Curated annotation (Swiss-Prot):
Record flagged with keyword Secreted: no
Subunit structure: Dimer of dimers.
Family affiliation: Belongs to the aldehyde dehydrogenase family.
Residue numbers annotated as active site: K162 (charge relay system), E252 (proton acceptor), C286 (nucleophile), E464 (charge relay system)
Gene field: betB
Binding of NAD(+), residues: G150, A151, W152, K176, P177, S178, E179, G230, T231, T232, T233, G254, C286, E387
Keyword NADP included in the entry's annotation: yes
The protein, known as: Betaine aldehyde dehydrogenase
HAMAP family noted in UniProt: BADH
Gene3D superfamilies registered for this protein in UniProt: Aldehyde Dehydrogenase, Chain A, domain 1 (3.40.605.10), Aldehyde Dehydrogenase, Chain A, domain 2 (3.40.309.10)
Organism: Pseudomonas putida (strain GB-1)
Site (described: Seems to be a necessary countercharge to the potassium cations): E248
Top-level taxon of the source organism: Bacteria
Lineage of origin: Bacteria, Pseudomonadati, Pseudomonadota, Gammaproteobacteria, Pseudomonadales
EC code(s) of this entry: 1.2.1.8
Pfam families documented for this protein: Aldedh
């Protein structure tokens, strides 16, 4: 018997059975335990969710801005009240350490919802004078029914990042979580209903991207799709969304981000930043700075500092608050990461740390991979070119600033980048030349609600968070008013 039994769909403010008996398993990657049997939505369920969302959206959009704001703020309060419970469930479902989920996942998701709840009354149009007898005014109106498709690494946080601006702007959202980590998104739906969100305004459909995701992206009455995931899948989602009914899209996709350490940098601080940029959340963060560039003359000293820090990582049971590095999200993903590690060895990179699956003692039943650092890497290696989405750092040496900027930009991705230096002029000079949408100077990884996040090149389209994202969930209606006479040419 699974610990959490059978998980149903969430449609029209309540849990409902899917149209078929098909289910998939939610697995604890730390132990292999089956946590739940999750129902698979059918195409008929998608239609029910769309109809429910259309009804609810009309009610939601008709509310005043302050009414919507109060309901979203109430949801924030409930999220914070239930923080520890939700964090524990997220840890079981994702394998992320409780020391992370308790202080980051729900906290930062609630922060984003609170941010947009405060912006609801600020959605305004413009008044544009034409002449004494005529003017134009604009209205920012909600799109209608939108879709969010989440990734498996930050399930509830991503659901909040996508739903917060959508709901704030007066839309409804149908959310499809990753098949790998579906449990906390269903809890979020409960919380929205408890807070007073009209039925249907936030529905959750569980199932595969190939089926449920496609039915949603191709549905003619969906107005926008916001997707987080890999670039290859993102291109398919974007093509499906645009070819079916010219839907608007936001794509937060993959990355292979560079971290450039300059010769004048504080090497201890740079090593700390590199560790966070590679091993936080067991390396499963889209913005990870996995290509670490270090001046050739500093490479040996930097390697020593990294090895010292890797040795301090506390790998273990993610439910233990002393653990700061848990398993990977699934056994299938573990095998994928291990295949990249094997490729790195084959292509001549030197293993500085890790490089294998952990199987002793409590690790035997879980999807644990040792924090891995490769050095003596070159730009043409597979581990340097392709997104691994695991705890694998590649150290590369360089000689000149011009060279490292060119090499940092030599990638199809452009999600994130960072620079470590004590020279403020150099910091901005380099950052301004890097082709990336999210950049840090002497830091890595923080993504506050106020900060727009998204990528260049193959790393995405549009932005999440920040004021600008709210506008992406509205459309402008322009109205000309004539107060004087009207002259016809006929």
């Amino acid at each position: 018997m699974a610990r959490f039994g059978t998980q149903k769909l969430y449609i029209d403010g309540a849990y409902v059975d899917a149209g078929s008996d098909a289910t998939f398993e939610a697995i604890n990657p730390a132990t292999g335990e089956v946590l739940a049997h999750v129902q698979r939505a059918t195409e008929a369920d998608v239609e029910k969710a769309v109809e429910s969302a259309e009804r609810g959206q009309k009610v939601w959009a008709a509310m005043t801005a302050m009414q919507r704001s109060r309901i979203l703020r109430r949801a924030v309060d409930i999220l914070r009240e239930r923080n520890d419970e939700l964090a524990q469930l997220e840890t079981l479902d994702t394998g992320k350490s409780y020391s992370e989920t308790r202080y980051v996942d729900i906290v930062t998701g609630a922060d984003v919802l609170e941010y947009y709840a405060g912006l609801v009354p600020a959605i305004e149009g413009e008044q544009i004078p034409l002449r004494e007898s005529s003017f134009v005014y604009t209205r920012r109106e909600p799109l209608g029914v939108t879709v969010g498709i989440g990734a498996w690494n930050y399930p509830i946080q991503i659901a909040l990042w996508k739903s917060a601006p959508a709901l704030a702007a007066g839309n409804a959202m149908i959310f499809k979580p990753s098949e790998v980590t579906s449990l906390t998104t269903l809890k979020l739906a409960e919380i929205y209903t408890e807070a007073g969100l009209p039925n249907g305004v936030f529905n959750v459909l569980t199932g595969s991207g190939r089926e449920v995701g496609t039915w949603l992206t191709e549905h003619p009455r969906i107005e926008k799709v916001s997707f987080t995931g890999g670039t290859t899948t993102g291109k398919k989602v974007m093509a499906s969304a645009s070819s079916s009914s010219l839907k608007e899209v936001t794509m937060e996709l993959g990355g292979k981000s560079p971290l450039i350490i300059c010769a004048d940098a504080d090497l201890d601080k740079a090593a700390d930043i590199a560790m966070m940029a590679n091993f936080y959340s067991s390396g499963q963060v889209c913005t990870n700075g996995t290509r670490v560039f270090i001046p050739a003359e500093m490479k040996a000293a930097f390697e020593a500092k990294i090895a010292e820090r890797v040795a301090r990582i506390r790998v273990g049971n993610p439910e233990d608050e002393n653990t700061n590095f848990g398993p990977l999200v699934s056994f299938a993903h573990m095998e994928n990461v291990l295949s990249y590690i094997a490729k790195g060895k084959e292509e001549g990179a030197r293993v500085l740390c890790g490089g294998e699956r952990l199987t002793e003692g409590e690790f035997a039943k879980g999807a644990f991979v040792a924090p891995t650092v490769f050095t003596d890497c070159s730009d043409d290696m597979t581990i340097v070119k392709e997104e691994i989405f695991g705890p694998v750092m590649s150290i590369l040496s360089y000689e000149t600033e011009e060279e490292v900027i060119r090499r940092a930009n030599d990638t199809e991705y452009g999600l994130a980048a960072g620079v470590c230096t004590n020279d403020i002029t150099r910091a901005h000079r380099i950052i301004h030349k890097l082709e990336a949408g999210i950049c840090w100077i002497n830091a890595w990884g923080e993504s506050p609600a106020e900060m727009p996040v998204g990528g260049y090149k193959q790393s995405g389209v549009g932005r999440e968070n920040g004021v600008s994202s709210l506008a992406q969930y509205t459309r402008i209606k322009s109205v000309q008013v004539e107060l004087g006479g009207y002259n016809s040419v006929f």
